[in-house]
A protein has these predicted regions:
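Non-globular targeting/processing and membrane-anchoring segments
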Residues: 1-32, 38-65, 69-119, 124-179
Length: 179
């Protein structure tokens, strides 16, 4: 993912300055289509429960495609602050960002991700600096979408990292079983 910068409620976030190779960058966007259909059930989930389930190396971004983007992220910030206790707020300080720009006008690497993904409401950047789409939110057991499925994506990206690093170790011989 190439460099990008976005205005946030706390100042401009510069990806190139923040990139360490140890963190995951996770983006959740609110979206309402022309018929009024939206992902408000997912967007409106309890952010405290969601955040508590994420790995500690996540930078979490909230943004919106809607014309009400500023109000959307201000309200999301209030919901986050109301759902975390003081210790959790301290632990996540500087790691939760509220994008103060309409998502469809974002440029740079993040803008490219938004333009190229089929459903850019939930996506991330892994530790290899690769753009990642999220999987399905559908829960077969309840026959509904379950926003908590989003918690698993960054855990999986973290789990893939040491495996991929190990594949490049000169002491490892990779053998293709099926081609």
């Amino acid at each position: 993912v190439p460099h990008f910068s976005v205005p946030t409620l706390d100042g401009t976030f510069y990806f190139q300055q923040e990139w360490t190779g140890h963190d995951i960058y996770y983006f959740l966007f609110k979206y309402t289509d022309s018929n009024g259909n939206s992902n408000s059930a997912t967007w409106g989930q309890n952010p405290g429960t969601f955040i508590r389930g994420l790995p500690e190396n996540v930078h979490l971004f909230f943004g919106s495609f809607d014309s009400t983007y500023h109000t959307d992220v201000v309200n999301r910030k209030a919901a986050v602050e109301n759902s975390l206790n003081p210790n959790e707020e301290t632990a996540w300080e500087g790691r939760i960002h509220y994008i103060d720009q309409r998502a469809n006008s974002i440029t740079g690497g993040l803008g490219q991700m938004i333009s190229n993904f089929n459903s850019p409401m939930y996506m991330g950047i892994d530790r290899f600096q690769m753009a990642r789409e999220t999987g399905s939110l559908y829960a077969w057991t309840s026959s509904n979408n379950d926003p908590k499925h989003l918690i698993h994506e960054p855990h999986q990206w973290n789990a893939e990292f040491p495996v991929e690093i190990r594949r490049h170790d000169s002491g490892v011989q990779e053998i293709t079983a099926l081609d």
